[in-house]
Amino acid sequence: ETGDNLMKEDWKPGTMIYPLPAVLVSCGSTPEEYNILTVAWTGTICTNPPMCYISVRPERHSYDIIKRNMEFVINLTTKDMARATDWCGVRSGKNYNKFEEMKLTPGKSTVVSAPLIEESPLCIECRVKEIVALGSHDMFIADVVNVRADTSHLNTETGKLELAESNLLVYVHGGYYGLGEKIGKFGWSVEKKK
């Protein structure tokens, strides 16, 4: 329905900001400790200095690993990684080696000791600055200390990263989705017509 007939109803307060990136967070300082955690409660919180966050339940296996090492890697996921992304969110690293089970490759990060995931098109190395207890989740506020990009997604002419072609995965209210078509670019609504 449109116009005056458009109906809305009140719902109880809840977490309804969607879509969100569905990322794999890798952590651990030694191969024996390496683990992967699926996270949708993540995002950018500052441009300069570059900072981001992940929110994790204290009972999750990765929580103690991240708290102990104070670093992690946010690995963006793709359509090809969808099964691994879901699986790593419903299985515990206490019982499984998630890298082996999902045939993901732990790679060497440049700055942090936590591994990156080689299959990810973009890996964001993070160092925890502050942990904020919020309720069901604690927020790990982190400085971005390095970004590693898969060169296959670099435009050789412009040098720009073209992540849209990598079939990024997003999370919407319990479901995983690919990105749709491009609608515009930042600032297009105010550009002067040539």
Segments from the language model and where they lie:
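Basic, polyanion-binding surface patches
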Residues: 2-194
